[in-house]
Amino acid sequence: MDPANRPLRVVTIGTGISGILMAYQIQKQCPNVEHVLYEKNADVGGTWLENRYPMAGCDVPSHAYTYPFAPNPDWPRYFSYAPDIWNYLDRVCKVFDLRRYMVFHTEVVGCYWNEDRGEWTVRLRQHVGGSEPRDFEDHCHILVHASGVFNNPQWPQIPGLHDRFQGRVIHTARWPDDYQESQWKHDRVAVIGSGASSIQTVPGMQPTVKHLDVFVRTGVWFGVLAGNTGSQTKEYTSTDKDEFRRNPAALVAHAKAIEDQVNGMWGAFYTGSKGQAMGSAFFRQRTANLIKDERLREGLDPSFAFGCRRITPGDPYMEAIQKENVDVHFTPVVSCTEKGVVGGDGVEREVDTIVCATGFDSSYRPRFPIVGRDGVDLREKWKECPNSYLGLAVPEMPNFFTFIGPTWPIQNGSVIGPLQAVSKYVVQWIKKAQNENLRSFVPRQDRTDQFNDHVQEWVKHTVWKDNCRSCTFLSRRPRLT
């Protein structure tokens, strides 16, 4: 048999933006490959299906958050909200008929490498309707982990939050359908956190909520891109969209111009650079121009370098926190009482609802066992100091790839380019395994160590060496991952 025609089976975990991309790439480029994607949710979308808190959206301009093979002239806004992005992903799946490879309502409970067979055994649990869950197994030659890092909510460790407080407790990543404007308009709400989800939730609730208490521990760099300022994201007109449809070159030029602006900030992320000094001065002054209250300006002023944490568009947030029905407290919440929250300042503030805008567990560790060669469990391997080869492969995990792994090359800007690079790399290995009849392949530990040593040396010259509570974080050892 011609090795190029060797049949392979690939299992991808997740049908978010990475899984959909993988489905498209394998369909287009990999003949004689059987591909199945397992998804715990009822449909595609991942983050953009699950996150529906007020004003949930992308902090990258819409036309820079688009697959290269599926430009979208119909983006409604410069920065799109979660439903807009889900509609785009849904359309991509329909146009390219990608759902035929996907199995929904099915969670992965464990993955185990079989050395003798050169295959992964994938254990699954399917939930359909009100029936009992069905457990079953699948097998594959290549396993692709595409479940991302923004799907496992990180709850704050606050005494009394879940067992003493008598009101409603919400995490932004699991926003309930029955808590909308008609419910919160009579509520006093505490919002904990100052990351992206808080920066979007606060202006989403402020106009109609009775009162907001916003608790901030960490300062914020508020960003802006030319062409979109003010309290609302710019909307594309019907004329804009008609022009993009008639003139694809104009659509591509618009997308490239946006990407040039986003990527043009790269020089500012080197410590001591002219770009860092100019960027810091510009955005600090812009924030000062928009926030008139000196206490708010000082409390939100970051103690870390511009770019260390992901830069977030924040004009609506800066406007909202200056309204009469909002109080900002620059203190952590240290405990909860039956009626409210107690800050580090010792003051109890009575509230009806607590919103935890505290992000996700971004430790890279999978939620289920992934057990590779010699019984090595990836959860344990990444417990102390996660590392990988190129952010996508791991020693002792044969025939395994992951999207958005440790030392993955993105902190600010769009993820689409790096995701595209990972998907193409996986396709190259699928073809190599077919053409050379490879039973297994895995990165060497010494080469992985060399790569990670290079990363740590490079990071010393950038803003990411700062301690800024970023999702690109310092592990328990002093290494950035």
From Swiss-Prot:
Database matches in InterPro entries: FAD-bind_Monooxygenase_sf (IPR051209), FAD/NAD-bd_sf (IPR036188), Flavin_mOase-like (IPR020946)
Cofactor annotation remark: Binds 1 FAD per subunit.
Sites where the protein binds NADP(+): G57, C58, D59, S194, G195, A196, S197, S198, I199, Q200, R217, T218
One Pfam family per UniProt: FMO-like
Entry superkingdom: Eukaryota
SUPFAM superfamilies membership: FAD/NAD(P)-binding domain
Positions marked as site (Transition state stabilizer): R310
Molecular-function annotations in GO: flavin adenine dinucleotide binding; N,N-dimethylaniline monooxygenase activity; NADP binding
Pathway of action: Mycotoxin biosynthesis; aflatoxin biosynthesis
EC number: 1.14.13.-
Listed cofactors: FAD
Keyword terms of this UniProt record: FAD, Flavoprotein, Monooxygenase, NADP, Oxidoreductase
Any Gene Ontology biological process: aflatoxin biosynthetic process
UniProt-annotated binding residues for FAD: T47, W48, L49, E50, D59, V60, Y65
Family matches, as PANTHER family: FAD-BINDING MONOOXYGENASE STCW (PTHR42877:SF1), L-ORNITHINE N(5)-MONOOXYGENASE-RELATED (PTHR42877)
Function comment: FAD-binding monooxygenase; part of the gene cluster that mediates the biosynthesis of aflatoxins, a group of polyketide-derived furanocoumarins, and part of the most toxic and carcinogenic compounds among the known mycotoxins. The four major aflatoxins produced by A.parasiticus are aflatoxin B1 (AFB1), aflatoxin B2 (AFB2), aflatoxin G1 (AFG1) and aflatoxin G2 (AFG2). The role of the FAD-binding monooxygenase aflW in aflatoxin biosynthesis has still to be characterized.
Family according to the record: Belongs to the FAD-binding monooxygenase family.
Protein name from the UniProt record: FAD-binding monooxygenase aflW
GN (gene name): aflW
